[in-house]
Structures are given as structure tokens and as C-alpha cells.
A protein has these predicted regions:
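Short, charged/polar connector segments at secondary-structure boundaries
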Residues: 1-106
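Amphipathic, charge-rich alpha-helical segments that serve as recognition/docking helices
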Residues: 49-53, 100-160
Length: 160
């Protein structure tokens, strides 16, 4: 049985996964292209994706934010070495909002996976992990069938 190390990561080093099916579909619809970057570099990217997540399910986000405010982050996320969030978009969004509202530094608790989208060989592995995490947690938002299809297609076909 292997234990995973969970780290408390300052939010400024993290960014939403532009390779995520739902997010990449939204980026293409709204902006055409959008350069993924951390808040430390420029908060514009994370702010635009956060707005999409807020609009996508305001009730779920409000519930997550209230829970984190009262009890702290109960479920850790998963991030890649470069700060790309593979699991935990809603928690990250809630923490960013709390950081702004409260005015104190917040930290995203996550396992750091030893992969990067820069390495083509890692992409399929990352997608398998992302989907396994997504399917293994009941409270996740369901993927729209089109977003899921685009996600799978982009991973399998465009990485050839």
C-alpha cells in the first residue's frame, strides 16, 4: 500500500487544466485560444476559467466554498509538476474566491503527479488518471457527452 504525499500549494503557482475536456471546449467556444498560465504570471487566464466554473454550477461552488470555509479542504486534489490542476477545479475556484474575500493566503492541498503535458508519452497516462479520478468520485459534475468525446478524441487522435 503506497501512501501519497499531499502538499499545501500556494494558489499563485496553480492553473486550470486547458487540456480538460470541459475547459478546453469552453476555451474554444469563448476565446478560440487562451494561453494557460499561473496567477503569478498573469491572473487573466485563471480569472476567465474561474468565471466559466462559477457560471457552470454556482450552487455546487457555493456549497464547496462554504464547506472549505467552515472545515478546511476535506478532499485533496491532483496537480502536475508545472501547477496544472488535474482534479480539483471547483475547490481551487472556491479557494481563490476565499483568498480574495478574506484577504489571507489560501493553499490548495494536492498530490503532485510526476508528469507533464510537454512529454507526449505522459499525455495518455494523465488522461487515464484524470478519467479514473473523475469516474471514481460521485460528487463530480457529469461530463457533457460532447465534451467527453472531444476530450477522448484530442487525447487519442491528436497525440499520434
Amino acid at each position: 500500500d503506497t501512501m501519497l504525499d499531499v502538499y499545501r500549494i500556494p494558489l499563485k503557482y496553480l492553473y486550470y487544466n486547458d487540456e480538460n475536456g470541459r475547459i478546453s471546449t469552453q476555451i474554444k467556444r469563448e476565446f478560440g485560444t487562451l494561453m494557460a498560465q499561473t496567477d503569478e504570471t498573469s491572473p487573466d487566464y485563471n480569472n476567465k476559467i474561474a468565471t466559466f466554473i462559477e457560471e457552470d454550477n454556482a450552487t455546487a461552488l457555493k456549497k464547496t466554498k462554504k464547506s472549505i470555509k467552515e472545515k478546511g479542504q476535506q478532499v485533496y486534489g491532483y496537480v502536475l509538476q508545472d501547477g496544472r490542476i488535474i482534479d480539483g477545479n471547483r475547490r481551487f475556484t472556491a479557494l481563490r474566491q476565499l483568498q480574495t474575500e478574506i484577504g489571507t493566503s489560501q493553499y490548495f492541498e494536492a498530490v503532485i503527479l510526476p508528469f507533464t503535458y510537454d512529454a507526449k508519452a505522459d499525455r495518455a497516462q494523465i488522461k487515464r488518471l484524470e478519467l479514473a479520478i473523475q469516474m471514481g468520485t460521485e460528487e463530480k459534475l457529469q461530463y457533457d457527452p460532447v465534451d467527453l468525446s472531444v476530450d477522448i478524441y484530442q487525447t487519442i487522435i491528436s497525440d499520434r
